């Protein structure tokens, strides 16, 4: 891994932390604070998607740039974020405090490296995610989808359903 501080660029890379949210009032302030600490040079965007709680207000108070997506659904939010935001590195995370921010610099460094990756995928499954997630059949479904995709595409992705991804500008804008 290339440390973020050693990435060679002609200017400071623009990093955007993108957080799609729907009713994340209870966790969004901590998510914004954690990613602000991990990536102090980043701009943090919270896209509120039809929340009925105070997600937007809490995110704004925590220092995030808040935008809204009126069409309900994560797909609409992600498309709007990718269209609206200009950056060299896009870090997609969820607003429910699922992903540890301490790994964000390493993910971004791979996208901003001299020989960059187009996308780096985070991995929840190597941690305590399955023991904490109590939804019935959720783990089995994730394992089945992961096995099928890895089998079909001859890949070795550990967490195919993760929302923790760093992406290059080239990947996002093409």
Show the residue positions of the predicted features:
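Short, Lys/Arg-enriched N-terminal segments with co-localized hydrophobic residues
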Residues: 1-8
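Cell-envelope/extracellular polymer assembly enzymes that use nucleotide-activated donors
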Residues: 14-16, 43
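Short, well-formed alpha-helical segments that are part of the catalytic scaffolds
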Residues: 23-37
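Donor nucleotide-sugar binding loop of glycosyltransferases
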Residues: 24-27, 51, 74
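A conserved acidic beta->alpha catalytic loop
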Residues: 48-56
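Acceptor/aglycone-binding surface of glycosyltransferases and processive sugar-polymer synthases
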Residues: 70-84, 101-174
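Short aromatic/hydrophobic "clamp" motif used to bind/position activated sugar donors
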Residues: 90
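The conserved acidic donor/metal-binding loop of glycosyltransferases
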Residues: 94-99
């Amino acid at each position: 891994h290339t440390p973020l501080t050693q990435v060679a660029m002609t200017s400071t890379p623009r990093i955007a932390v993108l957080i799609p949210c729907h009713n994340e009032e209870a966790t969004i302030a901590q998510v914004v604070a954690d990613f602000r600490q991990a990536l102090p040079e980043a701009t943090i965007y919270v896209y509120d998607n039809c929340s009925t709680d105070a997600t937007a207000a809490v995110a704004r108070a925590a220092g995030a740039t808040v935008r809204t997506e009126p069409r309900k659904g994560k797909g609409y939010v992600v498309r709007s974020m990718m269209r609206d935001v200009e950056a060299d590195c896009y870090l997609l995370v969820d607003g429910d405090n699922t992903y540890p921010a301490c790994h964000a610099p390493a993910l971004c460094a791979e996208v901003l490296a001299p020989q960059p990756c187009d996308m780096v995928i985070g991995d929840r499954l190597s941690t305590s995610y399955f023991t904490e997630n109590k939804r019935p059949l959720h783990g089995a479904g994730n394992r089945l989808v992961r096995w099928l995709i890895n089998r079909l595409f001859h890949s070795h992705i550990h967490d195919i359903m993760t929302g923790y991804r760093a992406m290059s500008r080239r990947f996002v804008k093409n």
